[in-house]
Curated annotation (Swiss-Prot):
It holds the Pfam family Cyto_heme_lyase. This is Probable holocytochrome-c-type synthase. One of its GO terms (molecular function) is holocytochrome-c synthase activity. Coiled coil: none annotated. PANTHER family: CYTOCHROME C1 HEME LYASE (PTHR12743), HOLOCYTOCHROME C-TYPE SYNTHASE (PTHR12743:SF0). It is found in: Mitochondrion inner membrane. It catalyses: holo-[cytochrome c] = apo-[cytochrome c] + heme b.
Length: 211
């Protein structure tokens, strides 16, 4: 899908694949006051096994002093139940690993775009983000309508702080190739690019197209 000037990444994942197939369930469980995960660390009533409440700190800067924290297995399990999924306690370690790896790769791709502005802003930060699973981007709809690609299973908009300027990035998440034996996707394909909200972002997209 390298039809335009985007950073496209494919990440291999292992079973269970269904957990991420309907959009990231925890990405919408955000406290609007500080854009942090609501820390529901209590065991779910349907839970049959204990889950860790330990949270891993990401490499993604949130402020000058701290980085974003990923949800714990317990938080992720609770969020999935809230979204009407049927998670299994024994799958949470794999689900968390996929979730965290995907987000780290998204940030890595964002930094590739931001590298053009390193003289102005050597340390961009992720200010906030929003899940928009059913709000398909214009590019995703174009690829689906005219080239027959499947629609992404999830979309996030990330707002990056570039020395006080808010720059919006659109991230589309696609299912990767299908395993012939299981019939399920074994990878996640990530399409990261700045939204064309101003002339500067349009220029970046055009310049990257010709690189």
């Amino acid at each position: 899908m390298g039809d335009d000037n985007t950073n496209n990444t494919s990440i291999t994942k292992s079973s269970p694949t269904d957990a991420m197939g309907g959009g990231c369930p925890i990405a919408h469980d955000i406290n609007p006051a500080n854009h942090m995960y609501k820390p529901n660390q209590n065991p779910h009533p349907d839970q049959t096994k204990p889950l860790s409440t330990e949270r891993i700190t990401s490499t993604i800067p949130r402020t000058e002093k701290d980085n974003w924290q990923y949800p714990s297995p317990q938080m992720f399990f609770n969020a999935m139940k809230k979204k009407q999924y049927e998670p299994k306690e024994e799958d949470m370690s794999v689900v968390i690993s996929i979730h965290n790896t995907v987000n780290e790769k998204c940030w890595e791709d964002v930094l590739q775009w931001e590298n053009d502005y390193k003289d102005v802003c050597p340390n961009p930060k992720l200010k906030k983000f929003k899940g928009k699973a059913t709000d398909f981007s214009p590019k995703a709809k174009f690829l689906n309508t005219f080239l027959g690609y499947k629609l992404p299973f999830d979309r996030h908009d990330w707002i990056v702080d570039r020395n006080g300027k808010e720059v919006r990035y659109v991230i589309d998440f696609y299912e990767g190739r299908i395993n012939k034996d299981s019939g399920k996707s074994i990878g996640i394909y990530i399409d990261v690019r700045p939204a064309i909200d101003d002339f500067s972002s349009l220029k970046d997209r055009v310049l990257h197209f010709f690189k």
